UniProtKB/Swiss-Prot annotation:
SMART domains: RRM. The gene is Ralyl. This is RNA-binding Raly-like protein. InterPro entries: hnRNP_C, Nucleotide-bd_a/b_plait_sf, RBD_domain_sf, RRM_dom, RRM_HNRPC/RALY_subfam. GO terms for molecular function: identical protein binding; RNA binding. Belongs to the RRM HNRPC family. RALY subfamily. Keywords: Coiled coil, RNA-binding.
Amino acid sequence: MTGKTQTSNITNKNDPKSINSRVFIGNLNTAIVKKVDIEAIFSKYGKIVGCSVHKGYAFVQYMSERHARAAVAGENARVIAGQPLDINMAGEPKPYRPKPGSKRPLSALYRLESKEPFLSVGGYVFDYDYYRDDFYNRLFDYHGRVPPPPRAVIPLKRPRVAVTTTRRGKGVFSMKGGSRSTVGGSSSSGSKLKSDELQTIKKELTQIKTKIDSLLGRLEKIEKQQKAEAEAQKKQLEESIELIQDECVSENADHSTEEPAEGGQEADGGEMTDGVEEDFDEDGGHELFLQIK
């Protein structure tokens, strides 16, 4: 698809004639379809004086309104590049179709003349943003957009109806605030549960604290006992060392006293024997002397 002549890119003139002869092309696959292709398709309905292509949509400006309406009637819902086109008159208001999650009011399509009189056309001005947003909404619809999952509906309890009869037989209905009571009961029960949980946590913490204190006390006792035992062993060892030293000193003293006593006895014995021998010699000599005589 190729166009014969190159047209202008201006499609945003605000005069009534231009707006009424302008065509909006939505759901357009602009990645494949180019400006020359659009001109080739829509030029058969009349002379095109302007064509502007944007991301996902385009505008075609005709010379007359009759040509624009013929293009809308002939090309709307045509499938190009795998997507059905959404073609409308750009200068006419469209019926607003609310979408899920969309809160754009119908007044967003047009603005009053008093706000922007220089863009007014018959009391209103055209809003290009609306066409762009509406185009993207319909684009998701064509591709089978899955609607968001419905919110879980919480069944509400029906309020109890108490029938009180009077003597005349007329029934007087009184509605009890069941929903209020349920809400109040749920809040009170929730606060009660929280307080109970806090109490249980407090008890558990106190139990843990007592256990830790008892363990610390036991450790202190064990440390004291071990320290006392170590001191006793050290004292006993010192006493045994002192006893051994005393015994060694006493033994040395005994040996030193015994040695001089033994030396004196030996000297006396020698002297005694020497005297006896002398006496014996003297006596023996005397006897021998007598015998010789």
